[in-house]
Amino acid sequence: MRLSSVFAFVFDIDGTLVDSNELHVDSWDRAFQRFGKQFPRDQLRAQIGKGSDQYLPEFLTPEEIKRFGKELDEYRSELFRKEYLPKVRPFPKVHELFQRIHDDNKRVVLASSGKKADTKYYIDLLKVGNLIDGYVSGDDADSSKPAPDVFGASLEKLGKISPAKAVTVGDTRFDIEAAKNAGLKTIAFLCGGTPESVLREAGAIAIYRDPADFLVHYEELMASGAER
């Protein structure tokens, strides 16, 4: 894939543009405990990046999901929105990165497995509403990551462009898997906490520390067209 031919970027949000992954772990931990379940934090963290439809089956039996899965998910979502969302902070240089991409006449769509209300909150937090071409949330897809639905819907937002003309940017192996399932390549960031070895094994075509690091190397990467 020659990155110099890329027409659009599809960005994940949590752990990629905003520092929220540990806050999600905290909220899931508290939600499970409220319903009498407790799991090691490293196990909870390892599944961050999935939407709740994919996350809950990793920890609950089908019978448990039927009995209280919806109630737990709603409790967790409300808990995160009330107590944790105000604590989320952008990673450095996100606005500058999006401005650079915009100045390069390339398009951007945000794609999250999270709730639509949270996604809209992040757009305001990042102050990038005038620099993006749209967004897709988990509410817009039948199945969340690692299913391809969210990224497929993102391509629709871009006018049904070929996957060869777009690249995703994410922070977890689930982003990379979902992108692959949609025919897309992925640039990965380390700021979400996933080890570099895991991202490389999953198939990331390039890995950067965070949005600021990507911004530093953006011109070089796009000019060379090379994978890193």
Question: Which functions belong to the PLM regions below?
Answer:
Residues 8, 145-176:
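Conserved Lys-Pro-Asp/Glu-containing loop-to-beta segment of HAD-superfamily phosphomonoesterases
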